[in-house]
C-alpha cells in the first residue's frame, strides 16, 4: 500500500525520504481530497491485467508508453531529473503506473505544504490537472513506469508560478468545494 507523509524543509538530497519530525503521515482519504487517485495493481501482469484495462476504459486512458529512468537508460539523465523535480503543473492529469523500481511524487496540499508520496512497483497514481507537483527518484536511482494519457500524449510542464492558467483555477475551485 502507498505511503505518504508531510515533508521536512531540508534542501539536501531530494532522493532522501525527508519525513517531517514529528512524523505526520498522510492517508489515502487526504490524498483523495486533493484530487490524487491511487490504485495498487499487479505490475507483473500489466500487459494483460483486466483491472488495468477496466481503469483505462473508465477513465479514457487511451495512450500508453513506458519510460525507464536511470543513468544508463534515459538520455540526458541529469537534465531530465532536474526538470522532473522542478515544481510544476500540467493542463491534463498526470498518470503513472510503477512497473519496477521506486520514486517519490511530491504534491502541494491546500496550505501549500509538501506531501511526499512513495511510489513502488504496482502503485498507480493520477494527479489532477492544475496541482503543483514534482517527481524524483529515491536512493535506488531507478524506476520503470507506464505513462498513460487521455488522447494524444502531452507532457508540457508549466513551472510555478502558473496560477493564471485555467487548469490551476479549476483545481483551486475543486479544492474549495472539497474543503
From Swiss-Prot:
In Gene Ontology terms, what is one molecular function of this protein? iron ion binding
Q: Which reaction does it catalyse?
A: 1,2-dihydroxy-5-(methylsulfanyl)pent-1-en-3-one + O2 = 4-methylsulfanyl-2-oxobutanoate + formate + 2 H(+); 1,2-dihydroxy-5-(methylsulfanyl)pent-1-en-3-one + O2 = 3-(methylsulfanyl)propanoate + CO + formate + 2 H(+)
One Gene Ontology cellular component annotation held by this UniProt entry: cytoplasm
What are the EC numbers?
1.13.11.54, 1.13.11.53
**Its membrane topology, per UniProt?**
Peripheral membrane protein
Binding of Ni(2+), residues: 88, 90, 94, 133
Q: In which pathway does it act?
A: Amino-acid biosynthesis; L-methionine biosynthesis via salvage pathway; L-methionine from S-methyl-5-thio-alpha-D-ribose 1-phosphate: step 5/6
Q: What assembly does the database describe for this protein?
A: Monomer. Interacts with MMP14.
Query: Under which name does UniProt file this protein?
Result: Acireductone dioxygenase
This chain's source organism reads Bos taurus
What gene does this protein come from?
ADI1
